[in-house]
From Swiss-Prot:
This is Mediator of RNA polymerase II transcription subunit 15. Residues 533-549 have a biased composition (Polar residues). Its main location: cytoplasm. It is found in: Cytoplasm; Nucleus. Component of the Mediator complex, a coactivator involved in the regulated transcription of nearly all RNA polymerase II-dependent genes. Mediator functions as a bridge to convey information from gene-specific regulatory proteins to the basal RNA polymerase II transcription machinery. Mediator is recruited to promoters by direct interactions with regulatory proteins and serves as a scaffold for the assembly of a functional preinitiation complex with RNA polymerase II and the general transcription factors. Required for cholesterol-dependent gene regulation. It comes from the Eukaryota. Residues 115-137, 183-211, 413-549 are annotated as: Disordered. Keywords: Activator, Cytoplasm, Nucleus, Transcription, Transcription regulation. The gene is med15. GO terms for cellular component: core mediator complex; cytoplasm; nucleoplasm. GO terms for molecular function: transcription coregulator activity. It comes from Danio rerio.
Amino acid sequence: MDVPGPDSDWRSPAFRQKVVAQIEEAMRKAGTGHTKSSTEMESHVFTKAKTREEYLSMVARLIIHFRDIHKKAQGGPDPINALQNLPGGVPGVIGPRPPGAQMGGMGQMSMGPHAMQGVAGGQQGAGAAGPMQQMIQQQQQQQQQQQQQQSIQFQTFQPQQQQQATMQSQQPSAMFQQIRLQQLQQHHQNQQMQHQNQQQQQAQNQQQQNQLHQTRMQQQLQLQQLQQQQQQQLHQQQVHAQAQAQAQAQAQAQAQAQAQAQAQAQAQAQAQAQAQAQAQAQAQAQAQSIQQMQQQQQLQVQAQGQPQVQGQGGAVQMPPHSQQQQVLVPQMVQGQHSQMSALSQQQQLKLQQAMQARMQQQQQQQQQQQQQQQQQQQQQQQQQQQQQQQQQQHQQQQVQQVQQASQLTAVPGQMMPRPGMQIPPRLPRATPNSAIPQNPVAIGGQQMPQAQQMMSSPSPVQVQTPQSMPPPPQPQPSPQPPSSQPNSVSSGPTPSPGGFQPSPSPQPSQSPASSRTPQSYPLQVPSPGPLNTPGNPSSVMSPAGASQSEDQLYMDKLRQLSKYIEPLRRMINKIDKNEDRKKDLSKMKSLLNILTDPNTRCPLKTLQKCEIALEKLKNDMAVPTPPPPPVPCTKKQYLCQPILDAVLANIRSPVFNHSLYRTFAPAMTAIHGPQITGPSIPSRKRKLEDDERQAIPNILQGEVARLNSKFLVNLDPSFCSNNGMVHLICKLDDKNLPSVPPLQLSIPADYPDQSPHWEDDGQQYEANPFLRTVHKNMTSKLLQLPDKHSVTALLNTWAQSVRQACLSA
């Protein structure tokens, strides 16, 4: 039979049809009539079988039964009954088989050339397909074959002759079936060995594949880590590059600013040089105009005596002496001419002196200007050095920021600050207050009474204006006035013979102080004083001065409202669990937050509204009336004033007495000793006669009764106790101590509130040194007792003094 496929294929219709065809062929070869068809027989076997092996074994037995019928050519019993009554003792037919063994003798049936070979081949194919399933099926097959011998019986009674006939018919083929079974077992064992080897190879292959897969996964993880590291390095490089680019851009901007500052300084130096040249030219022009005026005066004087032709004296610049010689020698008149020449000489001398003084002043001014320029250059160099230092610090800060950013980027998942969002710290501006007072122009500009017009920051050339200059004798317009200089850079007024007038074409220019500052200021300012610089306190209004009064009012109001803090807290605790007043609770909490939290600041108007709301809630909160404001005491505060204040504040507290006792009782006990209490007073009432006769207090009687037997106490008969005081005589009767004089005690009427008194009689203890020692010890030990002590304590002290004297002796 051809049995392809796994264990579940034996239930398929195709497989069952093949089995029906084989049964039909066996029935046809048997040649005898049967009551049932091959399909019915196969369906009966199919319903009885539970596994493939059981199904095949039952079909094989059925086919063997038909073959035996064919051999005997006799009518046998019903094949179904024969199938049910086959004995199980025949080896190799129904009995238990070893694992992997198949039905023997199936290859010998005349069912076709490839009938039973197909069964074996199908089983081999099935074994090759599932070796693990074959092992399980073989184990199940043994159990099922044992059960088949007992369970598969359709009819329990059959003739013994038929059974014997079938046994005899089956015996010839039993030996051959055993041989065939052994061959099949060996073949099946070989197949199992091959399958085991294949399984081992497959397991090894799977292990190798798993190892390869693991190595691939590790390689992929390493590649991902390398990619992440490369990305982080690229990002860090980009951050570094951006930071370096920013630093370079800032350095370039600073270099450009320095170059501009140097260019401005050079331009200012050129302007100053031009101004000096202009000043010299103006001085020369003034000298020429003065000479021309002198010549005109001389010509006028000469014209009065003798008419002469006037030459162009202003065109030639010659000394006054040579001009006098050229004009006065050929045209001299007696009397008037000599006087006029003398006057002209005096005027010339004065003019020469004035010119010399003017030249000296100009030289001094030039020297001062040069010194100022040198100072300005030094200041510029210092500022450049400071800027370089600031640049270096700024670059260091940027490098630190870049390092921090790189550290942040090294951790995945964190937010990385964008380099473009970083605002570089502004360089501290050079305070122009240090440079403006050094500029003489600014000081001069503020002190000039004539310059009332608005002008730009004046240049150092304006220092010439406030100086005094002797006016010419006759202020007349000169024939050659100083023309307007278009190339003049001076912004201040230039001196002219006609008075101090500004130049016709003043051009505003920046002063050195303004060029040094990195911030450009508005041009039209009256003086450098009100410039809005950080260092000028007059230009920037202090916010502290403006809000000082408001802060003071706010703090005073907050101090006034501090009395509502505790009542407000009690009110909040009271309505905290009341759900109906949640809104009021939130408002009260906000009010309490405003009053208690110093960081919470609200406007003064809001605080006033809070005061109104608290006044409305005053009755509900039961705010205590504030005490009158304390009078400022200039005297020294009393030492115990804090304790008195605390007592006054807590005097009405129900636990105040307990707190005082708990606080001060240990100290009072250490100072005054333990409280002396007498025995409890009996409940029964004494008779009046007993009270009148009783002269000694009960406390004292009880204490004397409890004394040690070594103390003998008696009343002193020499004293009467009319005033309530009790006098006692105490003796020491101790076998271990020597005899000493008795002790006389006086107990006050209010004992134990007052301590007993020892009536010291020094004469009794002056008899010998031993008694003097006892007296000394007694006196010193009494000082160590508390101010309130009992009779027992006093007597014990006396005994200790005697014992101490004995030890010292």
